[in-house]
Amino acid sequence: MFKDELLASYRDGALDDLNQRFTLFEARGSHEMVTVGPVPFSSLCAHHLLPFHGVAHVGYIPDKWLVGLSKIPRVVEHFARLLQMQERMTTQIADYLDANLHPQGLIVLVEARHLCMECRGVKTSGAITRTSALRGVAKSSSEVREEFYRLLSR
């Protein structure tokens, strides 16, 4: 279960498989924000080896390329299937998409519940941790960020 499911991205060739399936299409005048989410995921906390689970939301503004929409959940799944910290996973998803898609702007928002917070230590049931990563114009433009969050609230 651990090797084949929960930690599947440690398998030799897992990143190569992801790269081969990362299909790009010419944007051809499509330069408005694209959002995908909520994308459900489960991962294992690198500190406590307890699960955390939640959803990821991705928004990007294409430059030259659009990505096949099913590829974004594949990217989330790939990075969730490693021993993780939510902050690192959020950054890894953003870095991968930025490096392979080269968008004008990119936002990744991850929301998760951590069993290490619910079952031990502070024992806070139901707390949601939110992390974000911004790239390109999303970092410098409040309008881009507002559009992303507005699209999420629909």
Regions found by a protein language model. Give the residues of each.
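A domain-level signal for the structural core that forms small-molecule/cofactor-binding pockets
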Residues: 1-154
